[in-house]
UniProtKB/Swiss-Prot annotation:
It catalyses: L-glutamate 5-semialdehyde + phosphate + NADP(+) = L-glutamyl 5-phosphate + NADPH + H(+). Its EC number is 1.2.1.41. One of its GO terms (biological process) is L-proline biosynthetic process. It comes from Natronomonas pharaonis (strain ATCC 35678 / DSM 2160 / CIP 103997 / JCM 8858 / NBRC 14720 / NCIMB 2260 / Gabara). This is Gamma-glutamyl phosphate reductase. GO terms for molecular function: glutamate-5-semialdehyde dehydrogenase activity; NADP binding. One of its GO terms (cellular component) is cytoplasm. InterPro entries: Ald_DH/histidinol_DH, Ald_DH_C, Ald_DH_N, Aldehyde_DH_dom, G-glutamylP_reductase_CS, Glu-5-SA_DH, GPR_dom. It is found in: Cytoplasm. The gene is proA.
C-alpha cells in the first residue's frame, strides 16, 4: 500500500523531534555514509539518470522541454564526484546547532540564553536537477531538520535511486527524517499542511516559485527572479567596468546572479558603450538598448521594450540603459529589480555608499561582479538557494539559514511577583560571555 503524503509528513514531524537531539558526530557520520554510498552505487545512479535524459530528449524534440532543462538533468561521473565532495564538505562544516547566540543576566542566578535549534520539518519542491535532492537532504541533515523532498517528474528515476541510497545509508537515524513524494497532486497537499510543515524551499523557474508562494500559508524561503543590475558610474574605471559587466553576464548566464540590465551614466556612455558592446559581441551576447544606447551604438542593437527592464533572461541577452545620474540608476533598480543582487562600478566611495544604502536588495556590491552572490563564494558553504525576502534569512542561505532559536531561562526558584508591584526588584539585564550547556 502506498503511504500517503499526510502519513509521510507525520513521520517527518516525529523524526524531526528526535533528529534535533542527534549528536554532531552522528550527523557527520551519516553524511559521510551518504557520500560513500553514492560513490559505491554511482553506476546505478547513472543508469537511472540515463532513462530520465532519454525521455527528456524526446520531449525536447517534441518542443515540450528546453535544452537548459535537459542540461540541468544530466549527471555524469564528474558531476557525481562534485555531489560527493559537496556532501563531505557539508559534513565538515561547523555544527550550527546548540550555539549560544546571546547570554543575558536578568538578575542574580536568573540567566537567559538564546540558543540555535533546527527549524523542524522542511518541505522542498524542485525542478529538473537530481543533484538538488542530495544537496538539500545533506543540508537538512547537517542542520538537524527533517525534510520532505519533491522533485520534478522529469528526474523521477534519478530522484528515486538517490533517495533510496540516502535512506539506506542513514538507517540508524530516526525513521522518516527524509521523505520522498512524487505525484504532482502531492504538491498541493503539501502546500496546505501549514500545521505540519515549518518551511518551504522551492527551487525552479520564476513561475514555479510564484505558484508555491501564492498557494500556501507556510513560510517560503526563496526568490522568484534574479533581475540583477550593474551600474557604471561616471567616476568608474571603465576598463574595470567592462570586465565586471562581461563577467556578470557571460561567465554563467543561466544562473540567477547573472546581470540582466546594464545601466550606464550618460557622461561616459560615448566612451564606454562601444567597448562593452564589442566584448559582448565576441561572446554572442544579444543586446537590447534604450534610444540613447542605440544612438551611441549606431542602432546596431535591438530596441529594448518595457518588458526588458523586468526580465530575467537566463541567457546571453542583456538590456542596456543610459541614465542621467546615480539617483536615476537607484530609482530604476528599485522600480524594476527583483531585490536580488546589484553592483556599482565607481572610484567614488561616497557614491558607492549611497548606492549600497539606498537599494532594497539582498546583496549590493561595489566594484565586483554580481556573480559573487553565492553561498560558496560568501564562505557559507553549500547553499539551499537565494532568498530575496527580509524575514528569517536573506541572500545566499547556508546552514545557519536552516536554523532558528529558542530561549533557555536558568533560574533558582525565581518568581515574577518579586519583580512586580510597588517594591518590585529591578532587573539587571546585563549581557555576559557564557554558553548554555544541556
Amino acid at each position: 500500500m502506498t503511504e500517503t503524503t499526510e502519513a509521510k509528513v507525520d513521520a517527518a514531524q516525529t523524526a524531526a523531534l528526535e533528529l534535533a537531539n542527534e549528536s554532531d558526530e552522528a550527523r557527520q557520520e551519516n553524511l559521510q555514509a551518504i557520500a560513500d554510498a553514492i560513490d559505491e552505487r554511482r553506476a546505478e545512479v547513472l543508469e537511472a539518470n540515463e532513462k530520465d535524459v532519454e525521455a527528456a530528449e524526446e520531449m525536447l524534440e517534441a518542443g515540450e522541454y528546453s535544452q537548459a532543462l535537459v542540461d540541468r538533468l544530466k549527471l555524469s561521473d564528474a558531476k557525481l564526484d562534485s555531489i560527493i565532495e559537496m556532501v563531505r564538505s557539508v559534513a565538515g562544516q561547523e555544527d550550527p546547532l546548540g550555539k549560544t547566540l546571546t547570554a543575558r543576566e536578568l538578575d542574580d542566578g536568573l540567566d537567559l540564553y538564546k540558543v540555535s535549534v533546527p527549524i523542524g520539518v522542511i518541505g522542498t519542491v524542485f525542478e529538473s536537477r537530481p543533484d538538488a535532492l542530495v544537496q538539500i537532504a545533506a543540508l537538512s541533515l547537517r542542520s538537524g531538520n527533517a525534510v520532505i523532498l519533491k522533485g520534478g517528474s522529469e528526474a523521477s528515476h534519478s530522484n528515486r535511486v538517490l533517495y533510496e541510497i540516502i535512506r539506506e545509508a542513514t538507517a540508524d537515524l530516526p525513521d522518516g527524517w527524509a521523505q520522498l513524494i512524487e505525484a504532482r497532486e502531492d504538491v498541493d497537499r503539501l502546500l496546505g499542511m501549514d500545521d505540519s510543515v515549518d518551511l518551504l524551499m522551492p527551487r525552479g523557474s520564476s513561475a514555479f516559485v510564484s505558484y508555491i508562494q501564492d498557494n500556501t500559508s507556510i513560510p517560503v524561503l526563496g526568490h522568484t527572479e534574479g533581475v540583477c543590475h550593474v551600474y557604471v558610474d561616471d567616476a568608474a574605471d571603465l576598463d574595470m567596468a567592462t570586465d565586471i559587466a562581461y563577467d556578470a553576464k557571460v561567465q554563467y548566464p543561466a544562473v540567477c546572479n547573472a546581470v540582466e540590465t546594464l545601466l550606464v551614466h550618460e557622461d561616459v556612455a560615448e566612451e564606454y558603450l562601444p567597448d562593452i558592446a564589442a566584448r559582448y559581441a565576441e561572446a554572442d551576447v544579444e543586446m537590447r538598448g534604450d534610444e540613447a544606447t542605440r544612438s551611441v551604438l549606431d542602432r546596431d542593437i535591438e530596441a529594448a521594450t518595457d518588458d526588458d527592464w523586468t526580465s530575467e533572461y537566463g541567457d546571453l541577452i542583456v538590456a542596456i540603459k543610459v541614465v542621467d545620474s546615480l539617483e536615476s540608476a537607484i530609482d530604476h533598480i528599485n522600480t524594476n529589480g527583483s531585490k536580488h543582487t546589484e553592483s556599482i562600478v565607481t572610484e567614488d566611495d561616497g557614491r558607492a555608499s549611497t548606492f549600497m544604502r539606498r537599494l532594497d536588495s539582498a546583496s549590493v556590491f561595489h566594484n565586483a561582479s554580481t556573480r559573487f552572490s553565492d553561498g560558496y563564494r560568501f564562505g557559507l558553504g553549500a547553499e539551499v538557494g537565494i532568498s530575496t525576502g527580509k524575514i528569517h534569512a536573506r541572500g545566499p542561505v547556508g546552514l545557519k539559514g536552516l536554523t532558528t532559536y529558542k530561549y533557555h531561562l536558568e533560574g533558582d526558584g525565581h518568581l515574577v511577583a518579586t519583580y512586580a508591584g510597588e517594591d518590585a526588584k529591578p532587573f539587571s539585564h546585563e549581557e555576559f560571555d557564557g554558553e548554555w550547556s544541556p
